[in-house]
A protein has these predicted regions:
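A glycine-rich phosphate-binding loop feature that marks nucleotide/adenosyl-phosphate handling sites
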Residues: 41-46, 154-160, 218-223, 263-271, ...
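Catalytic-core signal marking the mid-to-C-terminal active-site face
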Residues: 2-11, 242, 249-250, 256-258, ...
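Short, hydrophobic beta-strand segments
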Residues: 114-120, 224-230, 277, 362
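Core alpha/beta catalytic barrel or barrel-like domain that forms the active/cofactor pocket
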Residues: 149-157, 173-188, 208-228, 258-276, ...
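Short glycine/proline-enriched loop/turn "hinge" motifs that connect secondary-structure elements
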Residues: 103-110, 148-149, 215-219, 268, ...
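Accessory "access/gating" subregions that flank catalytic or transport cores
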Residues: 185, 189-194, 198-212, 226-233, ...
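Active-site neighborhood of thiol-dependent amide/isopeptide-bond enzymes
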Residues: 230-241, 265-266
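ATP/Mg2+-dependent ligation/transfer catalytic cores
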Residues: 2-214, 236, 373, 407-410
Length: 410
């Protein structure tokens, strides 16, 4: 892998105190932005939208797309859905969320991408749009005076360019001139093999104003993990959505591919999107911790809700046939929803922490999941557990792989 210096077309993103179209207009002119990418996530988490000159975006009253963008699968084929709107394929209107304006640093000219919400012809939110699904869950928390906090960890593989799907994916050649073949988890030398891609990731993330906590080598050959800072659930879902595209572009710039398939290579561990979750009350206190610093009933009930309801959410956490190839015993992936303290063999892990940082890690979600839908599902399950006071099963102290499987096989 040749060492390349990142070429950045726009190295900074808007940081507007109270974003509105006029302040964004001034920023666009000051930074000589040429193009705007109007994007919205589909069910697969793919960015769908339109690209237009900045001047057109600033004067455009409405931007529209056909509703069929939500009925296309990851291959582009339309799902067999009996929905009347699919037959007429009418328009939906995009509404820009100006707080999401970010540079497109890999573009040939200065460009911004802006995530949009979508409404129907009556101006009502499209209920099944991924951001709206997550927003409804967050409103349920808000009605109780709670605020969920999440921190995603996103795993992915770097591979050699592969243009023929009949051939298996292979690790790329690193800076040493060799392919990675074995497990080198947490090896700094393994990370250094792909320092060109990682440098591009860091530079692109800085240009987009995205915070990276850490980047590590995972257990697979050329498998990396990006850990994100904890924060607001919608903002973090937006960041995962943006990061996937950013990482793919960084890899392409360095002559390799990045894949978020749950199980891209036989014999190698799969890729997950682990999500750490906690809940704050109106005073900003972690509801998972009691006043004496021990675990609270809300902590137990949150876990109980995840155990009760996450199996029904499997299509959101593991959306493809390939997703279930990841869930294999002794391959760094859970096969059930047991929980335990600092136990990575369970689907739900309670990491070691102080009372303020007490949280529950969902280790079931695959890297191929739509971040909005997966985060909505895991938070909804925990919410129902707290509201219904669902008691969890006893914590597992040892390995959980041989416990009864309660996650589906397909």
């Amino acid at each position: 892998m040749t060492k390349l210096t990142p070429e950045i077309s726009l190295s900074v993103s808007p940081d507007l105190a109270s974003p509105d179209l006029e302040s964004l207009r001034d920023w666009i002119r000051a930074h000589r932005v040429e193009e705007i990418e109007c994007v919205t996530p589909d069910f697969a988490g793919i960015a769908r939208g339109k690209v237009m000159p900045a001047a057109k975006f600033l004067r455009e009253s409405e931007i529209r797309l056909p509703v069929s963008i939500f009925f296309a699968g990851i291959t582009g084929e339309y799902a067999d859905v009996d929905h009347p709107e699919l037959y007429s394929d009418g328009d939906i209107t995009l509404i820009p969320d100006l707080t999401t304006a970010r540079a497109v640093p890999w573009a040939g000219e200065a460009s911004l991408q802006i995530i949009h919400d979508v409404v129907d012809r009556h101006g009502e939110p499209i209920a099944f749009a991924p951001r709206e699904v997550l927003r409804r869950v967050l409103r349920a928390y808000e009605a109780k005076g709670w605020t969920p906090v999440v921190a995603p960890e996103l795993e992915f593989y770097l591979t050699k360019p592969n243009t023929d799907p009949d051939y298996p994916l292979e690790p790329p050649v690193g800076r040493s001139g060799r392919q990675s073949t074995g497990s080198q988890a947490f090896s700094l030398s393994a990370v250094d093999e792909y320092d060109s891609v990682i440098e591009h990731i860091y530079d692109y993330a800085e240009a987009q104003g995205l915070e990276i906590d850490t980047i590590i080598q995972e257990a697979g050959a050329a498998q990396l993990e990006v850990n994100m800072m904890h924060g607001d659930a919608m903002k973090l879902a937006d960041q995962v959505f943006l990061f996937k595209r950013l990482i793919r572009e960084a890899a392409l710039r360095c002559g390799s591919y990045a894949t978020f398939m749950a199980k891209p290579m036989a014999g190698q561990p799969g890729s997950a999107m682990h999500v750490h979750q906690s809940v704050l009350d109106a005073q900003g206190r972690n509801v998972f911790s009691a006043q004496d610093g021990e675990t609270s009933p809300a902590f137990d009930h949150f876990i109980g809700g995840q155990q009760k309801y996450l199996p029904a959410c499997s299509a959101l956490n593991a959306p493809y046939v390939n997703s279930y190839r990841r869930m294999v015993k002794y391959m760094s992936a859970p096969v059930n929803l047991e929980w335990g303290y600092d136990n990575r063999s369970t689907g739900l892990r309670a990491p070691r922490s102080d009372p303020k940082g007490r949280r529950v890690e969902n280790r079931v979600i695959g890297a191929d999941a739509n971040p909005y839908l997966a985060i909505a599902a895991t938070l909804a399950a925990g919410f129902l557990g707290m509201v219904e006071e669902v008691e969890p099963r006893p914590a597992v102290a040892g390995g959980a792989y041989d416990n009864e499987r309660d996650l589906p096989y397909s």
